[in-house]
Amino acid sequence: MAKVTGLGGIFYKVADTAATQAWYQENLGVGGEWGAMFPFKNDDPEGFTLLSPFKADSDYFAPSGQQFMINLRVDDLDGMIAVLAAKGIEILGRQDEEYGRFAWILDPDGVKVELWQQLGGAPV
């Protein structure tokens, strides 16, 4: 039987695509002609991508007013936070859990971006 094998992309509307792509390139080091592309590798059996709905009244995406949030995997959360803070980007918060370390920022369109350094395997 055919099955879904992973997340193919996140697509959303913004007022100025060039400015948004430039911001992601300059501040997070991701981007290109078609946006941020991440090669699919399956060399880490513990790695995973999550598609997760939130309740309509959840405040987890705050202070963004958007109906979605982008989660980006990082390999060094402390290093990423230092780079972003040096560029004047506000770090909205930090949190460490047994399954990962998190920090949050807003992109220039007001979209909340969750930076995630995975610790351990997928939750059971």
Q: Predicted segments — roles?
A:
Residues 1-12, 29, 33, 81-124:
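Vicinal oxygen chelate
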Residues 2-5, 11-52, 86:
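Core segments of cupin and vicinal oxygen chelate
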Residues 9, 59, 66-69, 99:
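Generic anion/oxyanion-binding catalytic loop in active/binding sites
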Residues 28-66, 106-108, 112-120:
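Conserved short beta-strand elements that form part of the metal-binding/catalytic scaffold
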Residues 37, 71, 102-104:
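Conserved hydrophobic/aromatic beta-strand scaffold that supports enzyme active sites
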Residues 63-88:
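Mid-chain, well-packed structural core segment of small domains
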